[in-house]
Amino acid sequence: MEGRAEYRIVYPILARPVVTMGEFRFVVLNCSERGIRIAQRALPVPLEPGTTVMGQLALAQGEARPFRGRLLRLDSDSWVIELDGESRIPLPVIYQEQRYLRSRFPDWR
């Protein structure tokens, strides 16, 4: 649980989900019920913390979910998006994703 209030999945490189926002695709580094961290990629328009973003999250197990949230933080190598209430990932979906990853990557923790 990493001392957090919610369970977080840190993805193995070969199973990272993808976020699509318009014509741009980003790799997901980790996710929880309330947020996702994506690998940074330069955009033609600079984004600032607090910016509303929306798109599609394709989980490793194949489920695709639309999302809306706000850019919480920009780091040198990643962005953190806080998901809006209706876009949050239900805990059963997080557990299903975890089971999927464990079945495909037995050494993954």
What residue spans do the PLM features occupy?
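N-terminal helix initiation/capping motif
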Residues: 1-33, 39-44, 95-109
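Non-catalytic surface loops within mature trypsin-like serine protease
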Residues: 13, 42, 59, 85-87
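Short conserved beta-strand and strand-loop elements enriched in small hydrophobics
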Residues: 14-21, 50-64
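Short beta-strand-centered aromatic/proline hotspots
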Residues: 25-28, 65-72
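Generic beta-strand structural signal
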Residues: 31, 73-76
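Short, solvent-exposed secondary-structure boundary/capping segments
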Residues: 36-40, 75-86
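Surface-exposed connector loops and short turns at secondary-structure junctions
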Residues: 43-51
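Conserved RNA-binding domains used in RNP assembly and mRNA/RNA metabolism
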Residues: 82-91, 96-97
